[in-house]
Amino acid sequence: MITAEECRTYKEFVDLYQSYLYPLLGARLSRMYSPKNKVIIDMGTGPGYLSIQLAKRTNAHVHAVDINPAMHEIAQEEAKKSGVSSLISFDLEDVHHLSYADQYADFIVSYSCLHHWEDVVKGLKECYRVLAPGGKIVILDTFNPQGSHLEIMRKQIKEPEYFRFVREAFEESYSFEDIHQFVQDAGIPNYSLETFHFLPEDFIESLDELEDAPLWEQNDQSTDHEIESVTWMLTIEKEKEGAL
């Protein structure tokens, strides 16, 4: 677990280099959400930006889950600034031992967190247990890039204290084959795994927020293409009760 100081450094990194990603992710994920109980879990919320986006866009109750109290402190500050605190619960939870009841959540999301899980199979089983019939789990994370991807990002992210987070995410990442095996070992039947790409609708729905995002105006958006090319999306669906 990273220290409180490292959590603040991570937030600074995200604010400078990745803040524009969250409106785009929020747009995509909110379109994938089918409300039933109106409960969303953001597994590994970090600074809370994805939870905030989902709360704004879906009006569901979002559980912002993190195992690190220092990250929760940051996320709570950001939610208060955004005016959505009443829609978000900040839960100190371990993905391997979730306290939620069976079939509790309609939608479980996780961005750039799975590579931190100590036991991916156990974490997937817990998420699937908590997922309601008819619900979805959507997990996005990196796989280890080939060739020049890391060096390109090193040139774009010049601060060593920030680049560290990118390098470690790549070093701890899993291959497509690994993810397929984890899901199968977890006994999860209905899933898809693909390389992630933003869609035109994601940009259209996020234009107002993107205009205010650092680096968006002055760069050529090459960073988001690099992020896309090394990001996978796992989508798990639990069949509705009584479905054939």
UniProtKB/Swiss-Prot annotation:
Which Pfam families does this chain map to? Answer: Methyltransf_11 (PF08241)
Q: Fetch the InterPro entries from UniProt.
A: Methyltransf_11, SAM-dependent_MTases_sf
Superkingdom to which the source organism belongs: Bacteria
PANTHER family named in the record: METHYLTRANSFERASE, METHYLTRANSFERASE TYPE 11 DOMAIN-CONTAINING PROTEIN
Lineage, uppermost ranks = Bacteria, Bacillati, Bacillota, Bacilli, Bacillales
* GO MF term list: methyltransferase activity; S-adenosylmethionine-dependent methyltransferase activity
Provide the protein name: Uncharacterized protein YxbB
Q: Name the CDD domains for this protein.
A: AdoMet_MTases (cd02440)
Concerning its family, UniProt says: Belongs to the methyltransferase superfamily.
Q: Which SUPFAM superfamilies does its entry note?
A: S-adenosyl-L-methionine-dependent methyltransferases
